[in-house]
């Protein structure tokens, strides 16, 4: 199983890049984790936000690996505690398909992305900065993996 994080936005702050890359390097070779960045549409005073969202959504869905399970990161999604996320990760591994996790831009995810998703995951009821979500997802999935393999990273 391969994990893909497909996120709107490029040119992240150094601390985001460093945090995300740190967790990315920790993943085992049998569970590669790739980041695909989708350029954010230009937002200005007279921008057509609906059209920008549609275009970002089209690009995100085009980046999804064929046959991949799509999981959106969205406030109304399922809230998993760490042991539940570990169970989800095990379920995804048994399923055998790749998993594509989608993080939207400033206005969230396009309706097409939400419609294509098999699951939606909520990290928090809070609105989080989208760059920070990258680091939180990577850490959470690494922690879940550590539970499934009895790695000492996670402690109860």
Curated annotation (Swiss-Prot):
Q: Which UniProt keywords apply?
A: Cytoplasm, Methyltransferase, rRNA processing, S-adenosyl-L-methionine, Transferase
S-adenosyl-L-methionine among keywords: yes
> Which residue spans adopt a coiled-coil conformation according to this UniProt entry?
none
Q: Any keyword Methyltransferase?
A: yes
Main enzyme class: transferase
* Location, primary (coarse class): cytoplasm
Catalyses which reaction?
pseudouridine(1915) in 23S rRNA + S-adenosyl-L-methionine = N(3)-methylpseudouridine(1915) in 23S rRNA + S-adenosyl-L-homocysteine + H(+)
Q: Name one Pfam family in it.
A: SPOUT_MTase
Q: Where in the cell is it found?
A: Cytoplasm
> Where does this protein hold S-adenosyl-L-methionine?
73, 104, 123-128
Annotated EC: 2.1.1.177
Show the GO MF annotations.
rRNA (pseudouridine-N3-)-methyltransferase activity
Matching InterPro entries: Alpha/beta_knot_MTases, RlmH-like, tRNA_m1G_MTases_N
Q: Which GO terms describe its cellular component?
A: cytoplasm
> What does the protein in this record do?
Specifically methylates the pseudouridine at position 1915 (m3Psi1915) in 23S rRNA.
Subunit info? Homodimer.
Family statement:
Belongs to the RNA methyltransferase RlmH family.
Q: What is this protein called?
A: Ribosomal RNA large subunit methyltransferase H
User: In which organism is this protein found?
Assistant: Photorhabdus laumondii subsp. laumondii (strain DSM 15139 / CIP 105565 / TT01) (Photorhabdus luminescens subsp. laumondii)
Query: Quick one: which gene encodes this?
Result: rlmH
């Amino acid at each position: 199983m391969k994990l893909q994080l497909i996120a709107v936005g490029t040119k992240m702050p150094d601390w985001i890049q460093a945090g995300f890359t740190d967790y990315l390097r920790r993943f085992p070779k049998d569970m590669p984790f790739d980041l695909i960045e989708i350029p954010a549409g230009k937002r200005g005073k007279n921008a057509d936000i609906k059209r920008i969202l549609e275009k970002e959504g089209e690009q995100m869905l085009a980046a999804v690996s064929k046959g991949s399970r799509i999981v959106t990161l969205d406030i109304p999604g399922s809230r998993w505690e760490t042991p539940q996320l570990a169970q989800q990760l095990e379920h995804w591994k048994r399923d055998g398909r790749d998993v594509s996790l989608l993080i939207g831009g400033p206005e969230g995810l396009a309706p097409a992305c939400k419609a294509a998703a098999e699951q939606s995951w909520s990290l928090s009821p809070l609105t989080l900065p989208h760059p920070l979500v990258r680091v939180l997802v990577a850490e959470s999935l690494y922690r879940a993996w550590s539970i499934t393999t009895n790695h000492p990273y996670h402690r109860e």
